[in-house]
UniProtKB/Swiss-Prot annotation:
Belongs to the AIM39 family. It is found in: Mitochondrion membrane. The gene is AIM39. Residues 41-84 are annotated as: Disordered. GO terms for cellular component: mitochondrial membrane. Keywords: Membrane, Mitochondrion, Transit peptide, Transmembrane, Transmembrane helix. It is a single-pass membrane protein. This is Altered inheritance of mitochondria protein 39, mitochondrial. It comes from Candida glabrata (strain ATCC 2001 / BCRC 20586 / JCM 3761 / NBRC 0622 / NRRL Y-65 / CBS 138). The keyword Mitochondrion applies. The chain crosses the membrane at residues 108-130. Residues 1-29 form a transit peptide. Residues 54-63 have a biased composition (Basic and acidic residues). Its main location: mitochondrion. The keyword Mitochondrion applies.
Length: 343
């Protein structure tokens, strides 16, 4: 019989007590269910199944908070119940589109405000206040044809143009064979007197494209023929029309880089600007190509009227003369003179 001391018995007793206390904490027990071992990945959750009607507690962990879609079958009942209606989807889409439109509108307003601020700051703040110079802001293109301004009327005599054009028209009519045969020479109207102009109009035509814009100047007491809108002690402004000279713009760009047009080419073409008046002097004060055009009407009798058109630059230059006459209750036009026919 083996002798066991009290010390060994005491050690065995303590070891048994300690192991019985520690092992339940450190060792995981494996439970058996249905004859199969439980998957250790789903100790704290239930494994997924292929049953579409299973509860949420038995679903796949990847779709715990969202409905799953079965492969090869229609969407689950929960998924169908959670689908948004067409009206709700349309409302969401409209809200997103409205938000985008508001954002785009804010961006456009910001860019436009920055552009206007920069233009006004340079035009008024720098050129008018600092440099004390005149500045011009173009707004929109305008027609090349315009009425004579008050300043133009002081430099051009409309009565003189009317009288000279009347003489030139009578000269042309007296040389025409149709007028000589049907009305005779010297030409007389129904009252037996020399025909006179009954209606006459004058206007300007710029050769260069024109724009309408705002002119700014420092506010001063200097007299001017123009009507100004004023902000006292700040600046004054008015609306005006100005031509855009492409050749002058090119000259300015070349001068900025210390190159002149004479270094590149030299073209002399007075016919382009002054036509047949290349040996005449232009009107003083004009810094761009400007034509003064006129249209006149002269009656020969109750059924016959002469209409003529031309340009004025120191002298009158006729472009066209038409005769309008009523024949068999119809208005017939005869072209008596046309400038292109003589070239």
């Amino acid at each position: 019989m083996t002798y066991i001391s009290r010390t060994m018995l005491w050690q065995r007793y303590l070891g048994t007590r300690i192991s019985s206390t520690i092992l339940p904490v450190a060792v995981r027990r494996i439970h058996y269910g249905g004859g199969r071992l439980q998957d250790p990945r789903y100790v704290f959750s239930k494994p997924p199944t292929n049953d579409p009607n299973q509860s949420k507690e038995g679903r796949d962990g990847k779709h715990f908070f969202t409905p799953s879609v079965n492969d090869g079958t229609e969407n689950s009942t929960l998924h169908n119940n959670s689908r948004l209606s067409e009206s709700e989807m349309s409302s969401i889409a409209n809200a997103i589109a409205e938000q985008k439109r508001k954002r785009l509108k804010r961006s456009i307003i910001t860019i436009f405000s920055a552009f206007v601020t920069a233009v006004l700051g340079y035009t008024i703040g720098y050129k008018v206040w600092y440099l004390k110079e005149q500045s011009f802001i173009p707004l929109y293109p305008c027609s090349r044809v315009r009425k004579l301004s008050t300043r133009d009327l002081r430099r051009v005599s409309v009565k003189k143009i009317e009288d000279i054009s009347e003489v030139r028209v009578l000269e042309r009519l007296s040389q025409h064979k149709m007028i000589q045969e049907e009305y005779g020479v010297p030409l007389r109207d129904s009252n037996g007197k020399a025909p006179h102009v009954s209606d006459f109009s004058v206007w300007c035509e710029d050769q260069d494209p024109c724009v309408t814009g705002l002119v700014f100047e420092p506010d001063s007491n200097r007299q001017s023929s123009h009507s100004w809108y004023r902000i006292p002690y700040v600046f004054k402004w008015r609306i005006t029309h100005r031509p855009i000279s492409i050749s002058s713009f090119i000259d300015d760009v070349l001068n900025w880089i210390n190159v002149s047009t004479s270094d590149l080419f030299e073209v002399i073409s007075p016919e382009k600007v002054y036509g047949s008046f290349k040996y005449e002097y232009p009107i003083q004060g004009d810094n761009h190509s400007l034509h003064i055009c006129f249209l006149g009407e002269m009656k020969l009798d109750e059924n016959t009227t002469v209409i003529y058109k031309g340009k004025y630059h120191v002298d009158v230059k006729l472009e066209r003369i038409d005769l309008l006459r009523t024949e068999n209750k119809k208005l017939v036009r005869y072209i008596l003179f046309k400038e292109e026919d003589e070239k």
